[in-house]
Amino acid sequence: MAWSSSFLFIVLPLAAAVAVQPQDTELTFLLPAGRQECFYQTTLYNGSMEIEYQVIGGAGLDVDFSVTTPSGILLIMERRRSDGVHTVEPTEAGDYMICFDNSFSTISEKLVFFELIFDNQQGDEEPDSWADVVEPDELLDIKLEDIKESIESVKSRLERSIQMQTVLRAFEARDRNLQDSNLERVNFWSAINVGVLVTVAFLQVYMLKSLFDDKRKIRT
């Protein structure tokens, strides 16, 4: 079985050198027939990783999906699925392997979309240097901590909205590909039906005409 691998953290050149918070990632790729594609994503111990995938193109709209820990433990294994959502709570830091397998298909390639969403507590804690600049008596009954919480809440909701819009775009792409495939099938079989109808019509005219042809010889 042919397979290949990719590293998602190559977009972050310093990710391999220092422990940084993983960034949310989304990717759409073409999975050839009879192939397996694996991606490696670095995760932190105290965070969570949400994986969502959809097959948006290709016959059957299905792939095999698996997630393996850095130590080689198989966490998730799904066969012939068109989509899925999984939340992984990393029990060990390192590179998790995410694989999509199309080896069961010998002809059809698949267009696959997947997204990784991270929730790491340590990455959200930023130094509040701005809070040390303003004295408490200068806050005028407005707590800077409340303002910060409101901003963080708005930021979190906006990020979630972006993620949902990305997922909806993937659904729309899959539905559009499915409609295009159905349109081709409808046009193909409609053309065959028209051809059959025209052939039957000519045969009926020919047979009716032959019934009225008097081929008997007339004696004089």
Swiss-Prot record:
Motif annotated as COPI vesicle coat-binding, chain positions: 211-220
Cytoplasmic side: 209-220
Start and end residues of each GOLD domain: 36-118
Extracellular domain ranges by topology: 20-187
UniProt keyword list: Cell membrane, Coiled coil, Endoplasmic reticulum, Golgi apparatus, Membrane, Protein transport, Signal, Transmembrane, Transmembrane helix, Transport
SUPFAM superfamilies: Supernatant protein factor (SPF), C-terminal domain
Name this protein carries in UniProt: Transmembrane emp24 domain-containing protein 1
Source organism (scientific name): Xenopus tropicalis (Western clawed frog)
